């Protein structure tokens, strides 16, 4: 969240009391929407942990999702270099746009977003009836079986690469990625944790 010093340095006069706020998906990086906050809306956002704007049409505060239930849960807030715009990283609950899309800017999602969506689906399957899907049955088989599948798919991926079969390599790599995501979910880990660890190693 914003530090006290950052909050004091925000240039509300420059923006006539309404500061533009860009909301970005905290995991995928997709730009979700643009809104406006006055000081009260910012305070409410920080206090509640849910993105709250000042509606220029209704002339009041409104919590994004107060009607639809599609809230934006705040992860972090940062000012730009001129202190007249805010960037909010958030985890959306449902689609952000009233048209039912993930972003108010249309289909702007990077292909990486699919991995996040797949991860969410795999998390839902974790407690599903094993008879309803392969994934649910895999979870029910236990960690050892899931780990075994990751090992098998890893070997098959490597073998496909050694014979330079790009088509088969793509298929086997897809299977490996899927089973690895299932294993991470089984251990209550996610891609974000892995990515953060890679960032630390890179520094």
UniProtKB/Swiss-Prot annotation:
Family the entry assigns: In the N-terminal section; belongs to the PRA-CH family. In the C-terminal section; belongs to the PRA-PH family.
Entry's localization field: Cytoplasm
Keywords carried by this UniProt record: Amino-acid biosynthesis, ATP-binding, Cytoplasm, Histidine biosynthesis, Hydrolase, Multifunctional enzyme, Nucleotide-binding
GO biological process: L-histidine biosynthetic process
Top-level taxon: Bacteria
Pathway given in the UniProt record: Amino-acid biosynthesis; L-histidine biosynthesis; L-histidine from 5-phospho-alpha-D-ribose 1-diphosphate: step 2/9; Amino-acid biosynthesis; L-histidine biosynthesis; L-histidine from 5-phospho-alpha-D-ribose 1-diphosphate: step 3/9
Sequence segments annotated as region (Phosphoribosyl-AMP cyclohydrolase): 1-114
Entry GO terms, CC: cytoplasm
Alphabetized GO MF terms: ATP binding; phosphoribosyl-AMP cyclohydrolase activity; phosphoribosyl-ATP diphosphatase activity
Catalytic activity: 1-(5-phospho-beta-D-ribosyl)-ATP + H2O = 1-(5-phospho-beta-D-ribosyl)-5'-AMP + diphosphate + H(+); 1-(5-phospho-beta-D-ribosyl)-5'-AMP + H2O = 1-(5-phospho-beta-D-ribosyl)-5-[(5-phospho-beta-D-ribosylamino)methylideneamino]imidazole-4-carboxamide
EC number(s) on file: 3.5.4.19, 3.6.1.31
Protein name stated in the entry: Histidine biosynthesis bifunctional protein HisIE
Annotated region described as Phosphoribosyl-ATP pyrophosphohydrolase, given as residue ranges: 115-203
Entry-linked CDD domains: NTP-PPase_HisIE_like
InterPro entries: His_synth_HisIE, HisE, PRib-ATP_PPHydrolase-like, PRib_AMP_CycHydrolase_dom, PRib_AMP_CycHydrolase_sf
First-listed, main subcellular location of the protein, grouped into a coarse class: cytoplasm
Originating species: Shigella flexneri
PANTHER family referenced in this protein's UniProt entry, alphabetically: HISTIDINE BIOSYNTHESIS BIFUNCTIONAL PROTEIN, HISTIDINE BIOSYNTHESIS BIFUNCTIONAL PROTEIN HISIE
């Amino acid at each position: 969240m914003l530090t006290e010093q950052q909050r004091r340095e925000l240039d509300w006069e420059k923006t006539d009391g309404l500061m533009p706020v860009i909301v970005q998906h905290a995991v995928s990086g997709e730009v979700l929407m643009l809104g406006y906050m006055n000081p009260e809306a910012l305070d409410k956002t920080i206090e509640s942990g849910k993105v709250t704007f000042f509606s220029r049409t209704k002339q009041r505060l409104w919590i994004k999702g107060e009607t639809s239930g599609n809230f934006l849960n705040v992860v972090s807030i940062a000012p730009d270099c001129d202190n007249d715009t805010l960037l909010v990283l958030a985890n959306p609950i449902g689609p952000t746009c009233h048209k039912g899309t993930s972003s108010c800017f249309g289909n702007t999602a990077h292909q990486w977003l699919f991995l996040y969506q797949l991860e969410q689906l795999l998390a839902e399957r974790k407690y599903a009836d094993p008879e309803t899907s392969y994934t649910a049955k895999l979870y029910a088989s236990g960690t050892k079986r899931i780990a075994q599948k990751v090992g098998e798919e890893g070997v098959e991926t490597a073998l496909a690469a050694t014979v330079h079969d790009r088509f088969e390599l793509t298929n086997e790599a897809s299977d490996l990625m899927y089973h690895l995501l299932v294993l991470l979910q089984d251990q209550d880990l996610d891609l974000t944790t892995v990515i953060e660890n890679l960032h630390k190693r890179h520094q």
